[in-house]
Amino acid sequence: MKLAIAALLAGSAAAFAPAQSGKASTALNMAFESELGAQPPLGFFDPLGMLADADQERFDRLRYVEVKHGRIAHVAFLGQIVTRNGIHLSGNIDYAGNSFDSFPNGWAAISGPDAIPQAGLLQIVAFVGILELAVMKDVTGEGEFPGDFRNGALDFGWDTFDEETKLSKRAIELNNGRAAMMGILGLMVHEQLGGSIPIVGEM
């Protein structure tokens, strides 16, 4: 769990939060202050110095990581809400007859007395690995920006938008991804603390 929390924080730390006053920025950092993502209500923030002496390639790499973690957090947060409200896939998860709803929600499904068997966890890791290495990336090399995984197959009308609309939608995704990262982190913490919270219910 500590690893998951660290990954969520590291993925977003270089891109947002209030600008610090009284400290001179380097010329490179000043160039990044106008990048997409340095936007209200938080502005530009690099508390860990991850952009110190960084070039555009490193910035793009960090932005790619942030976008990817934001998308994962979206799915994770939605999954928490759905399963904790009693909605699960039908049928059995294995040949032993264990149903999807027979396993606990949240982190308890990964680590605990009633967790998913190791073979099941290995399947999850393998599936995520395949997505990471072969699917969720710019396969064709034609991506317009970090996180553009259309690969000539998915569009959803993106090319019909003007540049202002594209920037707006990308900014919205960044902000929502940041909120989702903090949201799933909050749920993970509350799960360890116990108790009940609105919408999600009993942790």
Curated annotation (Swiss-Prot):
Keywords: Chlorophyll, Chloroplast, Chromophore, Light-harvesting polypeptide, Membrane, Photosynthesis, Photosystem II, Plastid, Thylakoid, Transit peptide, Transmembrane. One of its GO terms (biological process) is photosynthesis, light harvesting. GO terms for molecular function: chlorophyll binding. Its main location: plastid. GO terms for cellular component: chloroplast thylakoid membrane; light-harvesting complex; photosystem II. It is found in: Plastid, Chloroplast thylakoid membrane. The light-harvesting complex (LHC) functions as a light receptor, it captures and delivers excitation energy to photosystems with which it is closely associated. Energy is transferred from the carotenoid and chlorophyll C (or B) to chlorophyll A and the photosynthetic reaction centers where it is used to synthesize ATP and reducing power. The LHC complex of chromophytic algae is composed of fucoxanthin, chlorophyll A and C bound non-covalently by fucoxanthin chlorophyll proteins (FCPs). The ratio of pigments in this LHC is; fucoxanthin: chlorophyll C: chlorophyll A; (0.6-1): (0.1-0.3): (1). This is Fucoxanthin-chlorophyll a-c binding protein, chloroplastic. It comes from Trieres chinensis.
